[in-house]
Amino acid sequence: MMKLKKRTFLILMAALTATFASAQKQPLPEWQSQYAVGLNKLAPHTYVWPYADASDIEKPGGYEQSPYYMSLNGKWKFNWVKNPDNRPKDFYQPSYYTGGWADINVPGNWERQGYGTAIYVNETYEFDDKMFNFKKNPPLVPSAENEVGSYRRTFKVPAAWKGRRVVLCCEGVISFYYVWVNGKLLGYNQGSKTAAEWDITDVLSEGENVVALEVYRWSSGAYLECQDMWRLSGIERDVYLYSTPKQYIADYKVSASLDKEQYKEGIFNLEVTVEGPSATASSIAYTLKDASGKQYYRMPFTSSPVD
């Protein structure tokens, strides 16, 4: 009988230990994790704007006048809550009703549009304060007071983009956000002042599409954003779409130097990264002009597929 009690006690202790260990290993939400920098984002690259014709580059208005660029700035539907527990959980679904939501301007911080409070501090963390009953503890940030803004809007892809690649770009969102198109999670980003892009070609529908962002005021990334400035939140830079051919210039690098013997002759070097179907070569040409627009050099060349 004594052995039975001891065995029962040991089993109970083992169960409690396993439960405690399981509770201890619960993963942090992405916005609390220093490892969750981004998900499914395209690799960073130099700005490469697509045009219908090379002559369009010279036209007034720049890349925004390209037929393969679409701004998503303007009025978005918006819901704001004081903490993550109260956020609308499935607002990103196209069937979700947002008729009672307010409108908000994008780009624009939500504190500047009637939601929450802008906080100014110098070199300290704005959430390391008695007001939030929180002491800094990286990577954790206050949860009960971590405001969440839910953004939604619709868009239609131009007919001329059919059969082409389509990319969504968010130039700057503070501090952490998830993004969906037509109810499908594209990924997330935790770099407030850096652009993030996702290829949305395969999730688009003919007709109306729905894009949604769930934005958190604070994240583990906030520990890297402590400087003398106003602490604000929301979509504060441009949001847009652009379209490229299936085979496209993904990046390029220009470098200039002088010959190593006399240091008189200039050396121009251009590296171009082409992505897309690798079965065919790419025809590329570059033109070198001075500040007045005078053409000095034009060079066509062909890139070969690389395994």
Language model region names:
Residues 25-104:
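Hydrophobic alpha-helical membrane-insertion signals
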Residues 26, 30-38, 59-63, 77-81, ...:
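Accessory beta-strand-rich segments of carbohydrate-active enzymes
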Residues 82-84, 90, 191, 254, ...:
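Residue-level structural signal for beta-strand termini and adjacent loop
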Residues 164-166, 264-272:
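Structural beta-strand segments of beta-rich domains
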Residues 1-25:
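Bacterial Sec-dependent N-terminal signal peptides
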Residues 89, 280-286:
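Short flexible loop/turn segments that cap and initiate beta-strands
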Residues 254-261:
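Short beta-strand segments of immunoglobulin-like
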Residues 86-97, 114-124, 255:
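Short, polar loop/linker segments at the starts of domains and inter-domain junctions
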